[in-house]
């Protein structure tokens, strides 16, 4: 009777909802593994699961006075993780057919993300041969019974949702020692817990995710700031979003691709969310791509109107772009205020009270954003991402990294770059963190000073940018940083070592591609290995396609919720080319994306990038990575720039051409370094050409198309 009373009470107060297939809990050997977000998690599971399980409760908790009162509701056994017999007792309970609940994290989350997963829980699952049933508890972290005070807006009676996930099994890992088997079992359970979080991620649009963040973290929470040094709260950002969304309707049609050429600023965030709320699809224009690159982008995405700022064009010396790109209409944000009518103001006021009604009807799977590739191997391609793919990548990042509302991001990478958009804007906004948007990553003295002044805890950038920040920064500038993430290019050992020596900070390297929104893998404090780019994110499937001549590794192909909707190409303007990849049998499979990158997985699942498939030369029958050649040159001449191209060779098939800004670099110095570091002599180029400056794309990457055109031309033309 008491049990029924409390169940009805909780159902009324918290509107508890249970979803999933409860039949998964009816087997003979069941181990239930929920996440742990509040002090009432155990009560919720005891009241609403269709079975009466035994709870494994850590002895430090089970000895508390209040546990005696709960004994009538919850059947529990004390668990001391330091005593092997406690683990064996749990194994026996499972083998006897009692459903057992273990909280693998061992403690209530203090970040809102998954905490450390204890190996013991995984070992119990593997040793007992149990069916593992993950359960996700959502909403209890918003109660006053959680440990997230100050990180979320706590409420007395938030809605609580219990998700019962599909059952799985955790086989006993193969390892010579029991300690290693236990550790591997813990890692396998950690993966199961991460996949469970991804399985219940919200299915919503970008605009709905902004509203959800406002609800979760509070409308008065600061969320974005720029060089005006006036932080915007979620409420203020929403107001700007509604204003922009309303006015954009006058210059565009629903479903239209609209160009956005804007700097890193708070208003840019409002324009993005405002556009998507009203069914417009922002195409993020790379203003560093020049007239030629922008013309390709405009053609591929069939853009008719570009929204920009007079002040931005003035400060960036970009007025030549609207003067030359006359095939589109240019709308300036400064002029929009004059278009606001009384009806617009009333509409904005009404939708501040009912913000969900401001969104036009759309589905998460529909197009939300267009980004453009760098064009390093040809014309820039339009990469169409849906609400689903962008938000899935944000959720993947949140699943493995413990970002909280106490964090402050420094975002200097441009928003037209997928790294800058997803990691630099969407992730902090939707995590409750505050982000400082700075318009240029090239200000190597100013960025460190701002990191110090704004108390930033998260910094990310390319290896080049991070190396320069470290050189110009005071040793105390980065005292608050706890995450330093490198992506978009290979992290140089010199940069890694400089950060370690000067600041005592570990740079975490990641890997991504625009087509994957963009993060594919990343090292995090709980799972990091130098020389790799981390493990593939949860929710993604990965496979390697064999490449002739490469024995260790293969071409990486990916499938997952963060994969793009497809390409827009100059050759077929406006026609969406859905992702598809050829498998090992030669069949084309829809939904798979071929990255074109050659990688290998180590025994623990960490990814090592070996180079682009297109950037391998076949010399005397052997495959040589052009990236390895460039790393060789950097080892000899770390302060200069180097890029490698291929030319035909009558005797060996292909030969290497090294372009360098180091006029003193010789084959002899490269040979000496190669022999010392075990690099094959085939990777040492004979043709070394000096350039005062490498041709670069707007992204800062070498322009390999131009370099390839120079290979067969006389060297003097470009020296």
From Swiss-Prot:
The topology of this chain with respect to the membrane is: Multi-pass membrane protein
Q: Which UniProt keywords apply?
A: Acyltransferase, ATP-binding, Cell inner membrane, Cell membrane, Ligase, Membrane, Multifunctional enzyme, Nucleotide-binding, Transferase, Transmembrane, Transmembrane helix
Question: Annotated region AMP-binding: where?
Answer: 233-646
Assigned EC number: 2.3.1.40, 6.2.1.20
Q: What is its main location?
A: membrane
- Asked if the record carries the keyword Cell wall biogenesis/degradation, the reply is no
Where is it found, in Gene Ontology cellular component terms? Answer: plasma membrane
- Gene Ontology biological process terms from the UniProt entry: fatty acid metabolic process; phospholipid biosynthetic process
* Protein localization: Cell inner membrane
**Catalytic activities:** a 2-acyl-sn-glycero-3-phosphoethanolamine + a fatty acyl-[ACP] = a 1,2-diacyl-sn-glycero-3-phosphoethanolamine + holo-[ACP]; a long-chain fatty acid + holo-[ACP] + ATP = a long-chain fatty acyl-[ACP] + AMP + diphosphate
Give the residue ranges for region: Acyltransferase.
15-138
- Please verify whether the record's keywords include Transferase: yes
The entry's active site is: 36
**What does this chain do?**
Plays a role in lysophospholipid acylation. Transfers fatty acids to the 1-position via an enzyme-bound acyl-ACP intermediate in the presence of ATP and magnesium. Its physiological function is to regenerate phosphatidylethanolamine from 2-acyl-glycero-3-phosphoethanolamine (2-acyl-GPE) formed by transacylation reactions or degradation by phospholipase A1.
- Know the name of this protein? Bifunctional protein Aas
What organism is listed for this UniProt entry? Citrobacter koseri (strain ATCC BAA-895 / CDC 4225-83 / SGSC4696)
């Amino acid at each position: 009777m008491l049990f029924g009373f409390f169940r009805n009470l909780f159902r009324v107060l918290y509107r508890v909802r249970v979803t999933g297939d409860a039949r998964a809990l009816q087997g003979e050997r069941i181990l239930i593994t929920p996440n742990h977000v509040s002090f009432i998690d155990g009560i919720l599971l005891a009241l609403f699961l269709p079975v009466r399980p035994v709870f494994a409760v850590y002895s430090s908790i089970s000895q508390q006075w209040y546990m005696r009162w709960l004994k009538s509701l919850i059947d529990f056994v004390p668990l001391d993780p330091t005593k092997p017999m406690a683990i064996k007792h749990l194994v026996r309970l499972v083998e006897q057919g009692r459903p057992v609940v273990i909280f693998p994290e061992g403690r209530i989350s203090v970040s809102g993300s998954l905490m450390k997963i204890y190996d013991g829980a995984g070992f119990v699952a593997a040793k007992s041969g149990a069916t593992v049933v993950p359960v996700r508890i959502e909403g209890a972290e918003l109660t006053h019974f959680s440990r997230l005070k100050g990180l979320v807006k706590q409420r007395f009676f938030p809605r609580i949702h219990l998700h019962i996930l599909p059952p799985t099994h955790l086989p006993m890992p193969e390892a010579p020692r029991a300690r290693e088997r236990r550790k591997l079992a813990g890692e396998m359970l950690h993966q199961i817990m991460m996949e469970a979080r991804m399985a219940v991620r919200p299915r919503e649009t970008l605009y709905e995710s902004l509203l959800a963040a406002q609800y979760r973290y509070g409308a008065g929470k600061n969320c974005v700031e720029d060089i005006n040094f006036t932080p915007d709260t979620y409420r203020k950002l929403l107001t700007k979003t509604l204003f922009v969304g309303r006015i954009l309707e006058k210059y565009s049609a629903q479903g239209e691709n609209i160009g956005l050429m804007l700097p890193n600023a708070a208003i840019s965030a409002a324009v993005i969310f405002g556009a998507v709320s009203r069914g417009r699809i922002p195409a993020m224009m790379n203003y560093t791509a020049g007239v030629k690159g922008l013309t390709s982008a405009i053609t591929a995405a069939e853009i008719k109107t570009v929204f920009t700022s007079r002040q931005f064009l003035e400060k960036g010396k970009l007025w030549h772009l609207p003067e030359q790109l006359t095939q589109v209409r240019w709308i300036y944000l400064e002029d929009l205020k004059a278009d606001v009518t009384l009806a617009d103001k009333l509409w904005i006021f009404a939708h501040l009270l009912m913000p969900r009604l401001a969104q036009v009807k759309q589905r998460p799977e529909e197009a939300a954003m267009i980004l453009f590739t760098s064009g390093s191997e040809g014309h820039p391609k339009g990469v169409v991402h849906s609400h689903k793919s962008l938000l899935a990548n944000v959720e993947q990042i949140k699943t493995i990294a413990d970002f909280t509302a106490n964090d402050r991001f420094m975002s200097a990478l441009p928003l037209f770059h997928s790294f800058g958009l997803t990691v630099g804007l969407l992730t902090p906004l939707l995590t409750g963190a505050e982000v400082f948007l700075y318009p240029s990553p090239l200000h190597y003295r100013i960025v460190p000073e701002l990191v110090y002044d704004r108390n930033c805890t998260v910094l990310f950038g390319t290896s080049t940018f991070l190396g320069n920040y470290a050189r110009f920064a005071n040793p105390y500038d980065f005292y608050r940083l706890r995450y330093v993430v490198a992506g978009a290019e290979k992290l140089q050992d010199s940069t890694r070592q400089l950060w370690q020596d000067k600041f005592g900070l570990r740079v975490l390297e990641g890997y991504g591609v625009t087509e994957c929104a963009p993060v594919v893998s990343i090292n995090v404090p709980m799972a990091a290995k130098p020389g790799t780019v981390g493990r593939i994110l949860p929710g993604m499937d990965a496979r390697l396609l064999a490449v002739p001549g490469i024995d260790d590794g293969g071409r990486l192909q990916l499938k997952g919720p963060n994969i793009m909707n497809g390409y827009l190409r100059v050759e077929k303007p406006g026609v969406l080319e859905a992702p598809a990849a050829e498998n090992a049998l030669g069949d084309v499979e829809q939904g798979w994306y071929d990255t074109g990158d050659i990688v290998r997985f180590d025994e623990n699942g960490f990814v090592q990038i070996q180079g682009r498939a297109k950037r391998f030369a076949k010399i005397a029958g052997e495959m040589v990575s052009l990236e390895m050649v460039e790393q060789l040159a950097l080892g000899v001449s770390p302060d200069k720039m180097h890029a490698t191209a291929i030319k035909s060779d009558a005797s060996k098939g292909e030969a290497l051409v090294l372009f360098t800004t180091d006029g003193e670099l010789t084959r002899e110095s490269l040979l000496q370094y190669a022999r010392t570091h075990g690099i094959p002599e085939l990777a040492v180029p004979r043709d070394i050409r000096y350039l005062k400056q490498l041709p670069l794309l707007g992204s800062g990457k070498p322009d390999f198309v131009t370099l390839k055109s120079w290979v067969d031309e006389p060297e003097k033309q470009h020296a």
